[in-house]
């Protein structure tokens, strides 16, 4: 891995100590890990260092941080952005994908799951789990409930295979199992998932 900076915008110290140790295993030297607790400082650090990987904790100031993600993608579109959030916050995760993130980590994830998610993202893939797949499919139906209303959604232009992958993931299959079932290479399944992310970003 190239020695390029990465940045963490963090709220949960214990979780981010774990993330830092995983990033070291993935090749990021500690001297190139930049830490920030607020968006004002993070914006300054972003301009100074142009990190290629940015971890953003969505525990606090969620709407402001979603807006910050959009700002990052405008000025640094090649940055890999990973959000950190609770597993049950699927609508927040969907909003983050709309803003342009490449992946996510849950507080509930094990060390191995965090390692695999970050590794998948850095090699060009995108993680997905059953609840997110179900959410995308329900969004695709045209209506989605928010806390205050039900609105008509702009449909996601999914291909037949992208729809099939989402259905299989919503049924509990992993990308690895889907690749075996479809007798295709895993990277092709990961490519379809990445394309789904990109289509959500364009909504």
Positions of the model-derived regions?
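Conserved catalytic core of two-component sensor histidine kinases
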Residues: 108, 115, 159, 166, ...
């Amino acid at each position: 891995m190239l020695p390029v900076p990465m940045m963490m915008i963090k709220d949960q110290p214990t979780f981010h100590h774990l993330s830092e140790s995983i990033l070291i295993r993935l090749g990021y030297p500690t001297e190139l890990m930049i830490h920030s607790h607020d968006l004002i400082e993070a914006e300054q650090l972003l301009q100074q260092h142009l990190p290629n990987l940015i971890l953003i904790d969505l525990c606090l100031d969620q709407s402001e941080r979603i807006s910050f993600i959009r700002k990052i993608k405008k000025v640094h579109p090649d940055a890999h952005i990973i959000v950190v959030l609770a597993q049950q916050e699927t609508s927040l995760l969907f909003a983050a994908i709309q803003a342009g993130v490449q992946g996510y980590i849950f507080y509930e994830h094990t060390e191995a799951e965090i390692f695999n998610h970050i590794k998948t993202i850095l090699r060009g893939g995108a993680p997905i789990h059953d609840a997110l797949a179900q959410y995308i499919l329900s969004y695709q139906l045209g209506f989605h409930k928010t806390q205050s209303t039900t609105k008509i959604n702009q449909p996601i232009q999914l291909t037949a295979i992208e729809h099939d992958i989402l259905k299989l993931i919503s049924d509990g299959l992993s990308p690895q199992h889907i690749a075996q079932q479809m007798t295709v290479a895993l990277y092709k399944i990961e490519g379809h998932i990445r394309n789904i992310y990109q289509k959500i970003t364009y909504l």
